[in-house]
């Protein structure tokens, strides 16, 4: 059985981020451009954050009541556990302290999951001799480019050409 670490997710961390956004007005602007809903591993947290992000983009206030209403309007309130679940999440958080650090950690966990899934796919392709090697290399390059951009380290990495001295 895989642990949360092996799955590269942390449900408590996800809830800390969502809870902070529910209880503090200044929290969502700190993470809205750093996180995407799919970065949340737990489906309910994914749905809650998607609703909050949509509300923020539309200029709507975010709190326990408005998020509950937004989820209900989207037909997702029962799927996330109802009003009780939103209340439970918000009650677990005292403040938005360390929110940006939590967001960075969540982003890193998501990137690790993406890496694991992408590399599994590449390993599967390499085992299938009917797949053209050039196609595998192109897919490898796409995966690495996507991961570089998601990590925000693209500007700090050197190209393969520079590393092997062809440029």
Regions inferred by a protein language model and the residue ranges of each:
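Peripheral, non-AAA+ core regions of ATP-driven protein-machinery
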Residues: 1-2, 131, 165
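Noncatalytic partner-interaction/assembly domains of nucleic-acid and motor enzyme complexes
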Residues: 1-111
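Extended, charged alpha-helical coiled-coil/arm scaffolds that mediate oligomerization and mechanical coupling
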Residues: 83-149, 153
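Phosphate-handling catalytic cores of nucleic-acid transaction enzymes
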Residues: 150-167
